[in-house]
């Protein structure tokens, strides 16, 4: 996640849109979109300079010729009442902070998870092995559950785990797996414990919880369930764009996508004397799906919500939205109180609260079950 409000806390932060950035005409260029219809060719270093100044964007260099961003989404009726409380509560009871701490300790031990680096490839391979182990342990592969690599033209692959249902319509939970040190993207130390190791291991633990339900494991849920771990989010939502563009091109139907980007930092709220809460993103999301998410939180989670905005192209839910799929995003806190260590070598596990991450996992289990089962 790379968010304007976090960097706005610095008095030295200035608007890049009005700045003149020198261009090295010999360098490889990338086409980025900073706002709807506002595009610019930049070098890779200019991309990172924009990020350092707090400007988010889509990297649309590899977008298909003639692609048009969706301006409307299909009208989808979401449940207005809770229907599977017993099943969800049984799954929630299996969620483990110890599992998440173990997984995040390992995931953040890679030197970095930069999408072009060997470390990014290695971390993705390790993460996919954990997903496969969860599927194997549940016996779900016998009923068609699987995990696959979604390959890109860079080192790190995205990961897609699928639990088939009676319908091909998909309920998606996603998180980006890559990390970055913005001062030295390729070689710098970037543990990325919160951004976004926290989201990655939170949805992994939620997957384990969901796989405790035999109706889901045996493919008897009404809808298909997918868990995604995206590559290259920090470079312009690259992995999620590729996946959702592919889904659009192949006619896949997505009932809803819930994004989890940073799930573990609460100190900003505590220091302000605020009640620890979820940050509900209200811009560039589907309002009806977000209303459904609020219902899930009120039923299955023990903390309240605060409305907040994160801007254009701030994280992977925006890729779903851009391709016409309804998406929602729940952050660890209001955007202006996010973890200040993101994108540095100080983004370590020491600053995270695993009870808060469990609340996110409870949300995911409830979201998936109530929407898919």
From Swiss-Prot:
Signal peptide coordinates: 1-18
InterPro entries per record: M28_fam (IPR045175), Peptidase_M28 (IPR007484)
Disulfide linkage: 310-314
Cofactor(s) needed by this chain: Zn(2+)
Cofactor binding note from Swiss-Prot or TrEMBL: Binds 2 Zn(2+) ions per subunit.
First-tier enzyme category under EC: hydrolase
Gene Ontology biological process: proteolysis
Lineage top rank: taxon: Eukaryota
Binding site for Zn(2+) 2: 195, 234, 343
Membrane spanning stretches: none
Gene Ontology terms: cellular component: extracellular region
GO MF terms, alphabetically ordered: aminopeptidase activity; metal ion binding; metalloexopeptidase activity
Keywords: Aminopeptidase, Disulfide bond, Glycoprotein, Hydrolase, Metal-binding, Protease, Secreted, Signal, Virulence, Zinc
Glycosylation site residues: 196, 288
Pfam families in alphabetical order: Peptidase_M28
Subcellular location: Secreted
EC id: 3.4.11.-
Entry binding sites for Zn(2+) 1: 176, 195, 261
Family (UniProt): Belongs to the peptidase M28 family. M28E subfamily.
Function: Extracellular aminopeptidase which contributes to pathogenicity.
Subunit structure: Monomer.
Name of the protein described by the UniProt record: Probable leucine aminopeptidase 1
Name of the encoding gene: LAP1
């Amino acid at each position: 996640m790379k968010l304007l409000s976090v960097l706005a806390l610095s008095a030295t932060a200035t608007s890049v849109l009005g700045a003149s950035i020198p261009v090295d005409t010999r360098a490889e260029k990338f086409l980025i979109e900073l706002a709807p219809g506002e595009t610019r060719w930049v070098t890779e270093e200019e991309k990172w300079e924009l990020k350092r100044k707090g400007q988010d964007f889509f990297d649309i260099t590899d977008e298909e010729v003639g692609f048009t961003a969706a301006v409307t989404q299909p009208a989808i009726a979401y449940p207005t009442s809770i229907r599977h409380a017993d099943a969800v509560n049984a799954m929630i009871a299996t969620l483990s902070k110890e599992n998440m701490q173990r997984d995040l300790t390992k995931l953040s031990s890679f030197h970095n998870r930069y999408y072009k680096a060997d470390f990014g490839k290695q971390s993705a391979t390790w993460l996919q092995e954990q997903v496969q182990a969860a599927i194997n342990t549940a016996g779900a592969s016998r009923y068609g559950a699987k995990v696959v690599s979604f390959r890109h033209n860079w080192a790190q692959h995205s990961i897609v785990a699928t639990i088939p249902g009676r319908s091909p319509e998909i309920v998606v939970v996603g998180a980006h797996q890559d990390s970055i040190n913005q001062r030295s993207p390729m070689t710098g130390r970037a543990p990325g414990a919160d951004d976004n190791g926290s989201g990655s291991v939170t949805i992994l633990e939620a997957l384990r919880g969901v796989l405790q339900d035999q109706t889901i494991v045996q493919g008897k849920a009404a809808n298909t369930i997918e868990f995604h771990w995206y590559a290259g989010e920090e470079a312009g939502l690259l992995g999620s764009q590729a996946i959702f563009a592919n889904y659009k091109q192949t006619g896949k139907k997505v009932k809803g996508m819930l994004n989890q980007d940073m799930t573990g930092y609460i100190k900003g709220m505590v220091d302000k004397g605020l009640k620890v809460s979820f940050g509900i993103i209200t811009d560039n999301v589907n309002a009806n799906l977000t209303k459904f998410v609020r219902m899930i939180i009120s039923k299955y989670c023990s903390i309240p919500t605060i409305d907040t905005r994160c801007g254009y192209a701030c994280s992977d839910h925006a890729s779903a939205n851009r391709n016409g799929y309804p998406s929602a995003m729940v952050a660890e806190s209001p955007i202006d109180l996010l973890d200040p260590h993101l994108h540095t070598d100080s983004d370590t596990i020491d600053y995270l609260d695993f009870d808060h991450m469990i609340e996110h996992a409870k949300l995911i289990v409830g979201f998936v079950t109530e929407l898919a089962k």
